[in-house]
Amino acid sequence: MAVAVRVIPCLDVDAGRVVKGVNFEGLRDAGDPVELAHRYDNGGADELTFLDVTASSGNRETTFDVVRRTAEEVFIPLTVGGGVRGVAEVDKLLRFGADKASINTAAVARPDVIDEITRHFGSQVLVLSVDARRTREGDQPTSSGFEVTTHGGRTGTGIDAVAWAKEAADRGVGEILLNSIDADGTKDGFDLELIRLVRAAVNIPIIASGGAGVPAHFPPAVEAGADAVLAASVFHFGPDDMIAQVKTAIRDAGFEVR
């Protein structure tokens, strides 16, 4: 039987509050993270992802207190990212109640950190977040046409996004959180080309992120190769039964959901 597609609300947190902007700019307050996490748990979410959107840029530590309070309220897997630099942060997150840690900027700066974390805790604990954007005129071209960015999409690296996902998979990362910076917050749908390219390169689960606006946007991402689908504003600002609507759309397209 096919593995069920996971539906994952994402909580972007800044100073203890959930926010959501378009293309990571102009953040808007979407509420209390613990309250929202509780709502999503009750609403049928399969997992939650919690990203401290200021941690890497402002070099601040992840808000461990919010993680602890969230973990006390929800009983579905919780992935936490933002400011994760190595074994010490992952250890602390797990102790505060996270199930998985997501790493981005620190892994780009020092890929060996992937090996260190997976050796210490196992692959299942580590998610590599890849903030990919299409290369633009004047950028260093990449063979896939997508480059890795860091610091919430603000800094281009010139690293090929598909090659980076493959390297991380080879190093033992458990899954890839594949976020399209171009599609993020637009509500125009996922970047299907990006998903297809990474799916062809790796054998580990892919969580598609960036661009969801309506339930109909989710099945094409699964068809393109995503094992899980992640979104923020469509859940934060949509009707209370949005997770159920998304699962119905995926099920109606012929895919298994939980």
Swiss-Prot record:
GO cellular component annotations of the record? cytoplasm
Q: Which UniProt keywords apply?
A: Amino-acid biosynthesis, Cytoplasm, Histidine biosynthesis, Lyase
Q: Name one GO molecular function term.
A: imidazoleglycerol-phosphate synthase activity
Q: What is this protein called?
A: Imidazole glycerol phosphate synthase subunit HisF
Report the NCBIfam families cross-referenced here: hisF (TIGR00735)
Q: Which domain of life is it from?
A: Bacteria
Q: Where in the cell is it found?
A: Cytoplasm
Subunit and interaction comment? Heterodimer of HisH and HisF.
What is the top EC class of this enzyme, as a single word?
lyase
